[in-house]
Amino acid sequence: MLFIVRVLGAISNNMPSIITQDDLEKAFRLLAGRLDLAQTETVRLVVCGGSALIATGLRQRTTKDVDIVALMNSSAHLVSPDPLPDFLLAAAKQVARDLGLFDNWLNNAPSSGEGGLYQMGLPQGIGERLTAREYGSRLMVYFIGRLDQIHFKLYAAVDQRDGTHLTDLRALKPTDIELEAAARWAMTHDVSDGFKMVLKETLRELGHESVAENI
């Protein structure tokens, strides 16, 4: 208990809602402390998006939230994060209040509902490319790897037309082989002709004309 109190006291309550790499570590440590105080079961989060880019050192930037694409069970199998456990959401709300984060700073938006990433199918082998971090006895966080970032970022860049995803994708410097694998995976999530057309345009914009022709 004394350890938890020291951790809580050591973390500033003036943390901005824009999350840096240091902020991310503080948030996870505090979340772990909240779970310990509540004596919850162990939770294992599989995280994608900007926070995973930051945590694994693939990009130096900020983010606004932590995107949970899956949970991992005690048998090391990935399972749906929809819905997230109530005890986790309660602890996350306390962290948001303590650190001044957005209310939904920890969310399952990428895999929420029937059309979510988990529900539609994750890239093959994603579980073998995770980077694990342990925060106390009740919180494990697994960050997705570079190849899976390429898959998700290409899909998001086409689906959402968001320049941030395209910027992240360029920073990952994907090869033709990696982009073709990502493109073919993305087309399993949206089989429409319109999506394929925009996907080809995006690949050409990235300078990968041959990939656009191959898919």
Predicted stretch roles:
Residues 2-215:
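Compositionally biased terminal segments of proteins
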